[in-house]
Amino acid sequence: MNHSLYLVAGLGKTGLSIARYLKRNNKSFVVFDTRKEAPGLAEFQNEFPDVPIYLQQTPDEVISQVTDVITSPGLALDTPVLESARQAGALIYGDIECLAREISAPVIAITGTNGKSTVTTLVGEMAKAAGFRVAVAGNIGTPVLDMLDDEHHYDLWVLELSSFQLDLTYSLSPVVATILNVTPDHLDRHHTMEAYTQAKQRIYRGAKAVLFNREDVYTVPHQSCQADIKCISFGKDAPSMGNWGLIEQENTIYLAKGMERLLPVESILIKGVHNWMNALAACALAEAAGISMQHILNVLKTFPGLPHRCQWVREVDGVGWINDSKGTNIGATISAINGIGGSMQGKIVLIAGGQGKGADFQELAQPVSEFVRSIVLIGEDADKIESALAKVVPVVRASSLEGAVTIAKTCAKPGDVVLLSPACASLDMFRDFNHRGDVFTSSVRGL
């Protein structure tokens, strides 16, 4: 029998979970990381003192022996070590592929540029309310392979999947899969919208039912739905039979399935049109997986939303403050501006900026001109945002987020909302988007 040697590519939380999985399965493996100071290195060496670790490069004689590379999604597929392993005949896949090969319980698979975590968490809560033993994992929370120890405890997996994870997954057969929306993101990695969309579309392969956004052509399955695959859609308009949407009656907007009104939107806690879409998607996914409508609607009425995602902070002198630090790309910020601006009388003072990931900030011009009073900019790509939007609304610069909060307070009028929705990644100034949101929230609480 051929001896298999696995290469774990990338340390960090995912890499550690892959190493534990391989050890449980008595597999031989070595570890590689592109960074000299790999995160989790000390913890790894403590747990696996005898496993060879290669930092920054892996010797050719090791690569030539590798049969399988299990890589963290953060590592680009054109990284030289992965290229060398591929040319030497190794199979390359990720932790979600390992999970797919191991489990028999049904999977709900969720991707999209924005709203993934909200929808994944919502569906998980609906499943829990219905009495399912549910694992909520993937691009959210605990790495999936760390949950495999307890696989026999789960009757359902709800997986949030990024485009990077989907690029590395081949065997997943979800009971229902969705792409919520696709707007430009990660183009520094995928290079083109076509490649990014292609990665997202992989989620539909092998799915028994697919849910797509009928207002977003990128989410429509490329393979037209075969007879044995159920196709469901959601959108802002009134839905046809079996699909999901909004119905307005006597000045009240309802979430609806077909002609059936399910719930007035004011009775759900997550606010803004984009969150109504998230709620519809969660309802459709949960129902497709066999969860009763009673449990679905009960959870919708009580779900408070996730931190750093259009999260209400407080009101000061008639001005509302909202933390949308998770708005790390243009699509998320457009959703937040349209969703919040469309449901209020005043204007938005927008705090934005950070690392733009190659995005075109001109796309913000239309919603900004409609709903935004002024913009306060921070971070690495402030110049690019200013040159795209300075002719649309007044733009001010701040050297820190705390400074931006102080400036925004002077720009806002009673009835306005100050919205932190950066349209950028946070790593130029912060540990991550959570850290950025926490700094904003504590600054606002100090006003």
Swiss-Prot record:
Keywords, alphabetical: ATP-binding, Cell cycle, Cell division, Cell shape, Cell wall biogenesis/degradation, Cytoplasm, Ligase, Nucleotide-binding, Peptidoglycan synthesis
Pathway(s) it belongs to: Cell wall biogenesis; peptidoglycan biosynthesis
UniProt-listed Pfam families: Mur_ligase_C (PF02875), Mur_ligase_M (PF08245), MurD-like_N (PF21799)
Broad class of where this protein is predominantly found: cytoplasm
Gene3D superfamilies in UniProt: Mur ligase, C-terminal domain, Mur-like, catalytic domain, NAD(P)-binding Rossmann-like Domain
Keyword match ATP-binding: yes
Enzyme type, top EC level: ligase
EC number in record: 6.3.2.9
Record's catalysed reaction(s): UDP-N-acetyl-alpha-D-muramoyl-L-alanine + D-glutamate + ATP = UDP-N-acetyl-alpha-D-muramoyl-L-alanyl-D-glutamate + ADP + phosphate + H(+)
Organism domain of life: Bacteria
Function: Cell wall formation. Catalyzes the addition of glutamate to the nucleotide precursor UDP-N-acetylmuramoyl-L-alanine (UMA).
Name under which the protein is recorded: UDP-N-acetylmuramoylalanine--D-glutamate ligase
Organism of provenance: Legionella pneumophila (strain Lens)
